[in-house]
């Protein structure tokens, strides 16, 4: 049997872990939705190119903001409404007037669109909006919202299509508001909570003489000695005369949100046809410590603005080399223990989680390591049952951000009674040098294997403790050397 490449096995294993457990839905604007949810903009850019940043792990699973049923009588507690109390989505609970990208909206009929990755039977959808006098610099709580939904759509206890749109009459508001969309699933005791950051701008454009042409997204921290700058394009191409450069000359400026703010300030100080910042209630461009939209003056012939970097130092590498994981472990009267070795590339934290085939977590270890450091780790499984298991290895940088993830498969097998000794010639790898065509050995999995005839019999003796590809039953290419009896 031809062994699948490791990369394919990794993909299959990852899909088993995450594909079924983390597939639900989110508020989108793919077809006719008025605005994307906060979590959606963590993964997908808006039509303006704007995205939310520093969202944590939920940026990889925007469909998974799932929490307890029954809002507002029950459901997520105050301060945890945006995350629905999901640990994946903790960052979504941050709340200030300038933390999140906002989408323009108007009072009256608006379409709200949901995209589903698993279209559960649905009880209903409800839409709430913040009160006119809410405080955008306090965590979202029930007191922030008008707790009478402005729109309720009956789900009929049937499965919706993979994308649905609801036309709702949005109440009159001014400035920055938050809409809470709640999808009440009919076949579980959970609901999905998506907050939508919107800004009411009246019936016409707030600044008709300006159009958005780019944005400053604080995607990464920089180092002292680096430079961040604007690349401005007009009808003829890039025009260096409009460039604004910011030298990163202090530790404070290395922080992503700080240099984004400083670059926006410098643009506003040095440019007359380019402005940066979020538009406030007085129609002023105010630089923020986060994503800063860039606007171009009408009639300037300027087309767009991009952000460039001059990086003086290479980006750090983060990785871990894992060894010691066997492809198979036999179950006995003591719990199965994995004895592993880790070697770090970069200053990292390695998280190791063992799952069985049913995706139950059986063991967890978190190991902080310095660059080049080696550490031994033992993981004792809380349950030992025969079948497929997975070891998920996550590499986090010093800021706790996920840099790499891989999944390794292994099996637990029941202990087998060894066959009679006269059924085999050797217990592998005893007598290795004398193996020839027809030699029978007892392998580590308790089965008997016979060395293949010439010309394959030469593979039977090709084994060392560090080169095990032809080891009967467990090596990556054992079928080239042996027949299982």
UniProtKB/Swiss-Prot annotation:
Q: Which Pfam family name is an example for this entry?
A: GbpA_2
Cell compartment(s), UniProt: Secreted
> What are the recorded GO MF terms, alphabetically?
chitin binding
Which stretches make up the Chitin-binding type-4 domain? 30-200
Please give the chief subcellular localization of this protein.
Answer: secreted
Q: Which residues form the Chitin-binding type-3 domain?
A: 437-478
Q: Which UniProt keywords apply?
A: Chitin-binding, Secreted, Signal
* Keyword presence, Secreted: yes
Signal peptide, first to last residue: 1-29
Give a GO cellular-component term.
extracellular region
Family under the similarity heading: Belongs to the GbpA family.
Q: What does this protein do?
A: Probably interacts with GlcNAc residues. May promote attachment to both epithelial cell surfaces and chitin.
Q: What is this protein called?
A: GlcNAc-binding protein A
Q: Which organism is it from?
A: Vibrio vulnificus (strain YJ016)
């Amino acid at each position: 049997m031809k062994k699948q490449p490791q990369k394919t096995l990794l993909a299959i294993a990852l899909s088993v872990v995450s594909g079924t457990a983390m597939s639900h839905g989110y508020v989108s604007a793919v077809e006719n939705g008025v605005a994307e949810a906060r979590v959606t903009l963590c993964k997908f850019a808006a039509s303006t190119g704007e995205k939310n940043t520093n969202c944590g792990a939920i940026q990889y699973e925007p469909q998974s903001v799932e929490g307890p049923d029954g809002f507002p009588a029950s459901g997520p507690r105050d301060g945890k409404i945006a995350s629905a109390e999901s640990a994946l989505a903790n960052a979504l609970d941050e709340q200030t007037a300038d933390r999140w990208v906002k989408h323009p909206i108007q009072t009256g009929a608006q379409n709200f669109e949901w995209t589903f990755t698993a279209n559960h039977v649905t009880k209903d959808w409800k839409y709430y909006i913040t009160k006119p006098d809410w405080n955008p610099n306090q965590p979202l709580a029930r007191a922030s919202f008008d707790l009478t939904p402005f729109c309720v759509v009956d789900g009929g206890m049937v499965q919706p299509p993979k994308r649905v749109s609801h036309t709702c009459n949005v109440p009159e508001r001014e400035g920055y508001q938050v809409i809470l969309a709640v999808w009440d699933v009919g076949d579980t005791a959970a609901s999905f909570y998506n907050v939508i950051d919107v800004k009411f701008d009246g019936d016409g454009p707030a600044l008709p003489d300006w159009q958005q042409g780019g944005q400053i997204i604080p995607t990464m921290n920089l180092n002292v000695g680096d430079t961040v700058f604007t690349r401005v394009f007009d009808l003829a191409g890039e025009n260096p005369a409009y460039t604004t450069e910011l030298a990163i000359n202090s530790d404070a400026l290395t922080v992503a949100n700080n240099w984004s703010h400083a670059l926006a300030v410098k643009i506003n100080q040095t440019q007359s046809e380019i402005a940066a910042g979020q538009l406030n209630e007085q129609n002023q461009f105010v630089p923020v410590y986060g994503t800063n939209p860039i606007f171009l003056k009408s009639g300037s012939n300027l087309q767009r603005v991009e952000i460039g970097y001059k990086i003086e130092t290479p980006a750090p590498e983060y990785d871990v080399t894992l060894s010691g994981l066997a492809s198979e472990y036999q179950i006995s009267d003591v719990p199965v223990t994995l004895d592993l070795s880790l070697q770090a590339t970069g200053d990292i934290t390695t998280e190791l989680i063992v799952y069985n085939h049913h995706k139950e977590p059986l063991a967890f270890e978190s190991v902080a390591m310095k660059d080049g450091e080696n550490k031994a780790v033992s993981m004792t499984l809380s349950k030992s049952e025969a079948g497929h298991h997975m070891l998920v290895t996550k590499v986090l940088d010093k800021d706790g951000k996920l840099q790499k993830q891989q999944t390794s498969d292994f099996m637990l097998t029941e202990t087998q009674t060894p066959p009679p000794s006269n059924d085999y010639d050797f217990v592998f790898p005893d007598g290795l040098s004398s193996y020839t065509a027809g030699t029978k050995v007892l392998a580590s999995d308790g089965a008997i294997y016979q060395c293949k005839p010439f010309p394959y019999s030469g593979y039977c003796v090709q084994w060392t403790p560090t080169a095990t590809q032809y080891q009967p039953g467990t090596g990556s290419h054992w079928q080239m050397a042996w027949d299982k009896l």
